């Protein structure tokens, strides 16, 4: 059986929920319920509301996804 293709999308974290779940507003305006990928969890990457993230989603259920990358934000010192 072939592995399914995942859909990559970008958005902004709008809400932090219990058990490392997040609500993300995608660039197209959709709301997605997401969790953190294992590699990000293992490397202690912290995600806060307002962060820009990359989300992977299955083509079968576009309302749920996995956060795979947090984009760097420009700090005031740069």
UniProtKB/Swiss-Prot annotation:
Gene3D superfamilies: Nucleic acid-binding proteins. PROSITE patterns: S1_IF1_TYPE (PS50832). It is found in: Plastid, Chloroplast. This is Translation initiation factor IF-1, chloroplastic. One of its GO terms (cellular component) is chloroplast. Belongs to the IF-1 family. Component of the 30S ribosomal translation pre-initiation complex which assembles on the 30S ribosome in the order IF-2 and IF-3, IF-1 and N-formylmethionyl-tRNA(fMet); mRNA recruitment can occur at any time during PIC assembly. Keywords: Chloroplast, Initiation factor, Plastid, Protein biosynthesis, RNA-binding, rRNA-binding. InterPro entries: NA-bd_OB-fold (IPR012340), RNA-binding_domain_S1_IF1 (IPR006196), TIF_IF1 (IPR004368). It holds the Pfam family eIF-1a. Residues 1-72 form the S1-like domain. CDD domains: S1_IF1. One of the essential components for the initiation of protein synthesis. Stabilizes the binding of IF-2 and IF-3 on the 30S subunit to which N-formylmethionyl-tRNA(fMet) subsequently binds. Helps modulate mRNA selection, yielding the 30S pre-initiation complex (PIC). Upon addition of the 50S ribosomal subunit IF-1, IF-2 and IF-3 are released leaving the mature 70S translation initiation complex. One of its GO terms (molecular function) is translation initiation factor activity. It comes from Huperzia lucidula (Shining clubmoss).
């Amino acid at each position: 059986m072939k592995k399914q293709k995942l859909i990559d999308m970008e958005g902004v974290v709008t809400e932090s929920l219990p058990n490392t779940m997040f609500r993300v507003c995608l660039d197209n305006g959709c709301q997605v319920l997401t969790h953190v990928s294992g590699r990000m969890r293992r490397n202690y990457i912290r995600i806060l509301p307002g962060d820009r993230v990359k989300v992977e989603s299955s083509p079968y259920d576009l309302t749920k996804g996995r956060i795979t990358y947090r984009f760097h934000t420009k700090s005031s010192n740069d």
